[in-house]
A protein has these predicted regions:
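N-terminal metal-binding scaffold of metallo-dependent hydrolase/deaminase domains
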Residues: 1-40, 52
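Divalent metal-coordination and catalytic microenvironments
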Residues: 6, 21, 26, 51, ...
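Short, glycine/acidic-enriched loop or turn micro-motifs at the edges of active sites
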Residues: 33, 63-65, 122, 211
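Divalent metal-binding segments
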Residues: 50, 77-122, 180-190
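Hydrophobic "anchor" residues on beta-strands that sit immediately upstream
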Residues: 58, 115, 204
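Active-site gating loops and adjacent loop-to-helix segments of metal-dependent hydrolytic enzymes
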Residues: 69-100, 138-148, 159, 212-214
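Metal-coordinating catalytic core of metallo-dependent amide/deamination hydrolases
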Residues: 126-214
Length: 214
């Protein structure tokens, strides 16, 4: 299939005006001027998007798709007030709601041109959403516990989730990782445990390195 448009944005090279992209079996096989590709592949079916731009999908490097239903509920307040409000509202959310919320977040991403996400989740809802919607990305299992006595249990639960999530997703598109929660939600020992697990199982790690001074 030749996908044609007024603009092709390869990103790694200059834009192509009046260009086309050859896609076969879900892979980009060629790119160039429409006329050139139609001569090169005369029997190829084509689809012309007209006055549009074809470009690689955008990447969202930090998202929480399962929290999408919280948008607009609490806003224009100090960070700590917002955080406490979201935490309180979260206790009223059913398991199925988290999955619906993650689907909503994934649809919002796709509508914005985002095709790859780095999502941090404690529920696993983002795994289901990414799998169903065809998103690419890294889904990080969040671990946050303040009580030192509960760290081993929290890590064991996270390890089990990571194993199960890895079996449920298309590993050609989705990678499972681990993420310690922000420092104000974690006992310091959690970071060491996360590092040990990530090193042992070769897991990607996401961390909140900055936040509000509050």
């Amino acid at each position: 299939m030749l996908l044609c448009a007024q603009y092709i944005l390869p990103i790694t090279s200059d834009p192509i005006v009046g260009g086309a992209v050859l896609v076969r079996d879900g892979r980009i096989c060629d790119i160039g001027k429409v006329e050139m590709l139609k001569l090169r592949y005369p029997d190829e079916e084509s689809l012309d998007y007209g006055t549009a731009a074809i470009m690689p999908g955008l990447v969202d490097l930090h998202t929480h798709m399962e929290n999408s239903i919280m948008r607009g509920i609490v806003h224009d307040v100090p960070y700590t007030t917002w955080l406490a409000s979201v935490a309180s509202l979260s206790t009223k959310v059913e398991v199925a709601d988290w999955y619906d919320s993650a689907i909503l977040g994934g649809l919002d991403a796709l509508a914005s041109g985002i095709t790859c996400v780095a999502d941090i989740t404690a529920t696993g809802a983002a795994c289901t959403a990414a799998q169903k919607l065809g998103l690419r990305g890294v889904i990080y299992r969040e671990v946050g516990v303040m009580d030192k006595r509960r760290i081993d249990f929290a890590m064991h639960s996270a390890e089990n989730d990571i194993m199960h999530w890895s079996q449920e997703v298309d590993t050609d598109r989705i990678t499972i990782g681990i993420a310690p929660a922000p420092i104000y939600m974690c006992h310091p020992a959690v970071f060491g445990k996360v590092s040990e697990l990530a090193t042992r199982d070769d897991l990607p790690v996401a961390m909140h390195l900055a936040g509000s001074r509050e």
